């Protein structure tokens, strides 16, 4: 599963699917499969703007898809949001998938990895906030010391 989350699309694949998508768009009608393939490539890009664009395309597809297609759309929406560190959104999608398919092992594993990432980022976030609080307290102490020395 971690391979799926960390896999990067090749520039060549991205350009090929982008060309196909734009060609169909120019002709006035983009097929669901073309839009999904392009979105799937974008979600695996190393650029956050591409990932966001892929998420938008997947969200557009969601109401149009069959049950099987929707499962894929929701899964890659979770993957895209995970890659953007939008863990709450990623969890929303993966838990929605697990409601309809409680035995989906891929979704269970993705949920576990999202929870793990949230805990890791949460601890890092708390450490940063704690460090900032110590820094502010230290600065206040130094200012207090300087003020008291200047009065002496």
UniProtKB/Swiss-Prot annotation:
Segments in the Mitochondrial intermembrane topological domain: 144-152
TPR repeats: 71-104
Bilayer-crossing regions: 123-143
Sites bearing Phosphoserine, chain numbering: 10
Keyword annotations from UniProtKB, A to Z: Acetylation, Apoptosis, Membrane, Mitochondrion, Mitochondrion outer membrane, Peroxisome, Phosphoprotein, TPR repeat, Transmembrane, Transmembrane helix, Ubl conjugation
Predominant place of localization: mitochondrion
Effect of residue 77 to A: Loss of mitochondrial fission-stimulating activity
Membrane topology: Single-pass membrane protein
Topology, Cytoplasmic side: 1-122
The UniProt record lists the keyword Transferase: no
Modified residues (N-acetylmethionine): 1
Subcellular location, record wording: Mitochondrion outer membrane; Peroxisome membrane
CDD domains: Fis1
Listed InterPro entries: Fis1 (IPR016543), Fis1_cytosol (IPR033745), Fis1_TPR_C (IPR028061), Fis1_TPR_N (IPR028058), TPR-like_helical_dom_sf (IPR011990)
Disulfide bond positions: none
UniProt effect for mutating residue 97 to A: Loss of mitochondrial fission-stimulating activity
A Gene Ontology cellular-component term: mitochondrion
Highest taxon of the lineage: Eukaryota
An example Gene Ontology molecular-function term: molecular adaptor activity
Post-translational modification: Ubiquitinated by MARCHF5.
Notes concerning its domains: The C-terminus is required for mitochondrial or peroxisomal localization, while the N-terminus is necessary for mitochondrial or peroxisomal fission, localization and regulation of the interaction with DNM1L.
Subunit structure and binding partners: Interacts with DNM1L/DLP1 through the TPR region; may form part of a larger protein complex at the endoplasmic reticulum-mitochondrial interface during mitochondrial fission. Interacts with MARCHF5. Interacts with MIEF1. Interacts with PEX11A, PEX11B and PEX11G.
Role summary: Involved in the fragmentation of the mitochondrial network and its perinuclear clustering. Plays a minor role in the recruitment and association of the fission mediator dynamin-related protein 1 (DNM1L) to the mitochondrial surface and mitochondrial fission. May not be essential for the assembly of functional fission complexes and the subsequent membrane scission event. Also mediates peroxisomal fission. May act when the products of fission are directed toward mitochondrial homeostasis, mitophagy, or apoptosis.
Family: Belongs to the FIS1 family.
Name recorded for this polypeptide: Mitochondrial fission 1 protein
GN (gene name): Fis1
């Amino acid at each position: 599963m971690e391979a799926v989350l960390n896999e990067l699309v090749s520039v060549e694949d991205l350009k090929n699917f982008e060309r196909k998508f734009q060609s169909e768009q120019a002709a006035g009608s983009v097929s669901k499969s073309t839009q999904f393939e392009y979105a799937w490539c974008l979600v695996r890009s190393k650029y956050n703007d591409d990932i966001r664009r892929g998420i938008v395309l997947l969200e557009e597809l969601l109401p149009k898809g069959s049950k099987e297609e929707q499962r894929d759309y929701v899964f890659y929406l979770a993957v895209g949001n995970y890659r953007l560190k939008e863990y709450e959104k990623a969890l929303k999608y993966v838990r929605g998938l697990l409601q309809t398919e409680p035995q989906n092992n891929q979704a269970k594993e993705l949920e576990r990895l999202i929870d793990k990432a949230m805990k890791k980022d949460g601890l890092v976030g708390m450490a940063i906030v704690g460090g900032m609080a110590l820094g502010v307290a230290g600065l206040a102490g130094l200012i207090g010391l300087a003020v008291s020395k200047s009065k002496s």
